[in-house]
Amino acid sequence: VWFAMFAGLTTASVPAAGPSTPPPVSTPAPPTGEAALDEPFTLAYGSTAAVDGGNLTITFEGIVEDSRCPSDVMCAWSGQVIVALHIEAAGEDAQTVELGGITDSEGVLRPQRPELSTVSSAAVGEYTVELLTATPYPAHANEPPSEAEYTLSLVVRR
């Protein structure tokens, strides 16, 4: 079975600073797109969408697992995809959620199977975020997609 595991760790070098220089401050990335409630939208790897006038932001942090059977391989199990989303809702603590499941060969999530521990939607405050698609579908066993190639389709409901 083919796996592409998300490392999720980055390092940055910070120049040496004297005692009077404050440490760098991490600020959230500005939204790279806007989305409406109840309307599907796409989110590329590393991008952030502002939903409902910015009351909810969703950032596609990475691929936790993509064990979907590549198109050029015969597998006993079709595998699944799990993605990590950083979600911030107004008045709520920010959280990272993992959504996923089994998809068809076009990356569209199929109805969830009870024996799998993955979920395709999550409640955050007054919102429900649902994963609809995860593409690209792996085509070749020896050439898994890079994280930068992934795009998700999501919908947010209140």
Over which residues does each language-model region extend?
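Surface-exposed, beta-sheet-biased, low-hydrophobicity segments with strongly acidic/polar composition
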Residues: 15-158
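Sec-dependent N-terminal signal peptides
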Residues: 1-16
